[in-house]
Regions:
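Acidic/histidine-rich catalytic cores and adjacent linkers
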Residues: 3, 252, 285-406
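Conserved beta-strand -> loop -> alpha-helix junction used to position metal-binding or nucleic-acid-contacting
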Residues: 234-241, 246-284
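DNA-recognition alpha helix
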Residues: 124-135
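Short, amphipathic alpha-helical "recognition" segments used to contact nucleic acids or chromatin
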Residues: 108-120
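Alpha-helix N-cap/N′ positions at the starts of helices
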Residues: 105-109, 278
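Short, conserved DNA-binding cores of transcription-related domains
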Residues: 1-100
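RNase H-like nuclease fold core
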Residues: 63, 87-90, 98-103, 136, ...
Length: 406
């Protein structure tokens, strides 16, 4: 006998209930309303989980966050357009999953699982979330099958063609604990972020390695070139020995600026806590100077004041002076992008937000999968060019007119 596919029990579909439907259009209208109502209930469940208590519960008193009404949102469904109420919290921290921000369609189960995984949840956490909030039974093996599909997407993303010219490329890494041959060790996910000619940022790729070296970065830069990058006007890096020469061997015309933020942090390692605030303020006079000559004078002043007490904090400035002061070749607006827009540090912080629940990863693939999903979430918000982009782009074109094609 053919098994009935009963989504709704027969006792619910009574004659009285069915009498309201006269045409197929009546059924479609009902399903449209039902779909919207179910989504709203799912979102309320998400808000309960986010706040840690149900609506009107006294356990929510003095918790530091609470519901703050809702706002209407248009969504597209197979039954047409609907308007649903999206709940919001007082602190503005609620991120709906069933109907994500900036999207007009609810998520399928597969996309819902991947979205939860991107938030840093483990497979077992997702299983519990799906059961308790969405009342959907999914085994851990089924969830793993879904999340493993991310590997293919990440590989395709990593191998995608890139643009021929990037105005600036920032290079840095973020450390994770990863299991390797039965041991938990530190591994670094290295990232390259490019600034495009339209003023938007783009993560060019990620590479996992045990230790940073000029030969490792040689492989990264070779990969970028193989994927279509012909020229990088300015590169911003940390102070790795041989890094500048490595970059010039692949992109010989590129100007390399050692990251000032890394330099400040490196110098402060040699300064005791009670002096750090004053020492940092004095260092600021160096990179805020109007030109390289004044900056050199400010470095001399720093050495006169602190050199006797902290010689090694000054020495790294001296040893890397030329690569630390490349930004003085450029107009003020471009300088600020190079040395004050701490883009990579900001990106790393957002990745940490998505991965904070993971104490360690079972493999390189696992960490790459999680970082990839984090990057996809982060890049959704990279929709606006850098401030004053029209002026900045004109300055780039004047300085690099033979290397930029519009």
């Amino acid at each position: 006998m053919k098994e009935k596919n009963q989504v709704v029990p027969d006792e619910v579909l009574s004659k009285e209930f069915l009498s309201q439907f006269k045409t197929e259009a009546d059924v479609s209208k009902f399903l449209k309303q039902l779909h919207a109502q179910v989504l709203e209930k799912m979102l309320e469940g998400e808000m309960d989980a986010h706040l840690g208590y149900e609506k009107n519960s006294v356990t929510g008193n003095n918790t530091g966050n609470s519901r703050n009404g809702s706002y209407p949102k248009k969504i597209q469904t197979e039954h047409g357009e609907s308007v649903i109420s999206i709940p919001r919290d007082r602190n503005g921290q609620f991120e709906p999953i069933a109907v994500p921000k900036h999207e007009s369609r609810g998520l399928s189960i597969e996309k819902l699982v991947i979205s939860l995984y991107a938030k840093g949840m483990s497979v077992s956490d997702i299983e519990e979330e799906m059961r308790e909030i969405y009342e959907i039974e999914l085994s851990t093996s089924a969830i793993s099958i879904i999340t493993n599909k991310v590997n293919q997407a990440a590989q395709e993303w990593q191998n995608r063609p890139l643009g021929p010219v990037y105005l600036i490329v920032w290079m840095d890494g973020i450390v994770f604990k990863v299991r390797d041959n039965g041991k938990i060790i530190n591994k670094t996910v290295y990232l390259c972020v490019g600034l495009k000619q339209n003023g938007l940022k783009e993560v060019l790729g990620m590479w996992v390695g045990k230790s940073e070296s000029s030969s490792f970065w040689m492989g990264v830069l070779t990969d970028l070139k193989a994927r279509g990058v012909q020229d990088i006007l300015i590169t911003c890096t940390d102070n790795l020995n041989g890094f500048t020469d490595t970059i010039r061997s692949i992109f010989p015309q590129s100007s390399t600026q050692i990251c000032v933020v890394h330099q400040i942090r490196n110098s402060c390692k040699y300064v005791v806590y009670k002096d750090k605030k004053e020492f940092t303020a004095d260092m600021k006079n160096i990179y805020n100077a109007p030109n390289k000559e004044v900056a050199a004078t400010e470095l001399d002043n720093l050495e006169k004041k602190w050199g006797g007490k902290y010689p090694y904090a000054i020495l790294s400035w001296r040893n890397n002076w030329d690569d630390l002061t490349v930004f003085f070749q450029f107009p003020l607006e471009i300088r600020k992008i190079i040395y004050t827009t701490n883009l990579i540090e900001n990106l790393n912080g957002k990745i940490r937000k998505y991965t904070k629940s993971k104490l360690s990863f079972p493999s390189d693939d696992a960490v790459k999968k999680t970082v990839y999903l984090s990057l996809m979430e982060i890049e959704k918000k990279w929709t606006m060019p850098i401030s004053n982009w029209g002026l900045i782009m004109n300055q780039f074109m004047l300085m690099f007119e033979n290397r930029i094609q519009i």
